[in-house]
């Protein structure tokens, strides 16, 4: 799509929270420092805590120093950015706040030429979404005022199919779908975007991207950290809700989708939805065949002893919450019929890593060995984080007088090739929202399909009669039962 730079105002509701401090303002600063943020712009922070505009600016200065990818080169540059920051205190449940926000926006817009473009960011707990959406509608702030008006909503988008539909209904009563941006920061990561370029801009890969050549796909999102201070939240969520429903299913759809007509929001969302429709529904009677859950116990991470999940603050001593989840999904269409997609995510794993591994079939006839098992099949690994890049393994002759084969890797690393670290995901996604490009956001129907797919698993795990989650040692790659889970197809989990 064509991008034009116009003035805009961003209102961050929940500006005193961690998301604003660690991600949003650092991303906005990095965009400004890189001269990619449209100007003139204004950023209005709002939260319950009382603070002056100067106090807010000082806090954001400390935030940028600590968390931004790009550090302020000089006070002059920072001062120019800070002059666009302001603060409006208030309770998001109080209609009076929205009158104050309207007045602040009108003052900013009246002092500069150009349309009144407004972007609202819900950086609050999801429990406040309904209240905020309702107040934005009742106050008239949701209606465009001579420019565009948009809203960004953070995950989780509900906690099941019913609540997701309710949230979409609340949003739809106030905003049009093209005004709504449901953010999944994984889609803003450089390597995730490069997945589509890899597929559709290189003729060597797309002909192999099907059941005739691909034996299996593994998608891993592992975290070395535990629940930290989020024990109470995690008790209500769990790994399946927190990570699988959004991040991993989005990655699956990007990997499995057909080529869109153009790389624009509508065609891309349509193709991702076709994948969701093609995923084989989960039979409630066969949950154990397609899903497995685990929970971390005590262990060692980087040589330090750590407590198990049930010993974390805010967690019930008899909790059955999943901190590890694995799925085996099948995509029943012409391209992927019979190819298993294995998805796994967990906390307190051996290390922090996110990757997609595409394992290809073995050669149909190995002429170099009588036993073809001596040569590993080709594998393409797309590393999402850390150390963004790609690696392709191929068979090659090892040096020496005898004909012996070994596996070698062709490795591409972003930092080495481009000489700079990739931008943070929020930088790309915030800029896309300003430019009206929702390609890397989630659409309402996709969100509901994802919850509908996982509903049988969530229902089964919620039953009192359900088995306890399998325990795994903190610092490991998950429960031992997960290896039996994948070995039923003759496979094995990769060790990233």
Where are the regions a protein language model picked out?
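Secretory/organelle targeting and membrane-embedding segments
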Residues: 1-153, 157-496
